[in-house]
């Protein structure tokens, strides 16, 4: 999830001022036009993260990210005015950069579903490694041969955004399935069997039968 989720926004954020200058804005204008998306990005980050805690549906609300970005990336890729209509191009890119940012949600899921300190450290590090790998990938999507329209690169971004649907939905279904299976086994036990399990089990952290995954 961390590998692919942020590639479209990372690419556009990296090339924002370059793209704005290439479509007719001055350097000063490009720097000023980059400010609004930072403000909206912060507001949406807090809003989405708060909502997931309130609704207790983290992966469900995380679907807002591809639902939001896929149509905009489709416009960026297939609209004939992309890179020609400067204000239209700027508006689309800014809206994409203001997408619901799910990084905080993913980190919290790694932490909560790890349960033990040892596992939490490993899972969080692995997640961050995948995020960094995504940054490396994003730096190689826009190529000189694809400039100045970046049709091929924008097509890749569109495909990656689409791929987030099965990733998020699949993750949700897996966690729900595991929790249901554990509920069946746990509820089938008598109180004595539960007490015996809790006092004798060698299972730790998220492997425990009485642990339920957050999703």
Swiss-Prot record:
InterPro entries: MFS_trans_sf. The keyword Membrane applies. It is found in: Membrane. The chain crosses the membrane at residues 3-23, 30-50, 59-79, 87-107, 122-142, 156-176. It is a multi-pass membrane protein. Its main location: membrane. GO terms for cellular component: endoplasmic reticulum; membrane. Keywords: Membrane, Transmembrane, Transmembrane helix, Transport. One of its GO terms (biological process) is transmembrane transport. One of its GO terms (molecular function) is transmembrane transporter activity. Belongs to the major facilitator superfamily. Allantoate permease family. This is Putative uncharacterized transporter YOL162W. It comes from Saccharomyces cerevisiae (strain ATCC 204508 / S288c) (Baker's yeast).
């Amino acid at each position: 999830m961390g590998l692919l989720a942020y590639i479209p926004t990372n690419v556009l954020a990296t090339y924002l001022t370059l793209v704005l200058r290439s479509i007719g804005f001055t350097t000063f204008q490009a720097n000023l036009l980059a400010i609004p998306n930072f403000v909206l990005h912060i507001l949406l980050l807090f809003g989405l993260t708060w909502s997931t805690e309130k609704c207790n549906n983290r992966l469900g609300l995380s679907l807002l990210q591809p639902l939001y970005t896929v149509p905009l990336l489709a416009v960026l890729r297939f609209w004939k005015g992309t890179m020609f209509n400067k204000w239209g191009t700027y508006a689309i890119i800014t809206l994409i950069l203001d997408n619901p940012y799910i990084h905080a949600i993913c980190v919290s899921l790694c932490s909560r579903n790890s349960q033990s300190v040892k596992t939490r450290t490993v899972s969080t590090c692995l997640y961050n490694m995948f995020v960094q790998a995504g940054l490396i990938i994003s730096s190689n999507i826009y190529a000189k041969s694809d400039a100045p329209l970046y049709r091929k690169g924008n097509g890749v971004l569109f495909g990656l955004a689409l791929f987030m649907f099965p990733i998020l939905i699949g993750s949700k279904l897996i966690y729900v399935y595991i929790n249901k299976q554990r509920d069946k086994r746990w509820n089938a036990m008598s109180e004595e069997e539960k007490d015996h399990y809790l006092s004798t089990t060698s299972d730790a952290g998220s492997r425990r039968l009485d642990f339920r995954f957050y999703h």
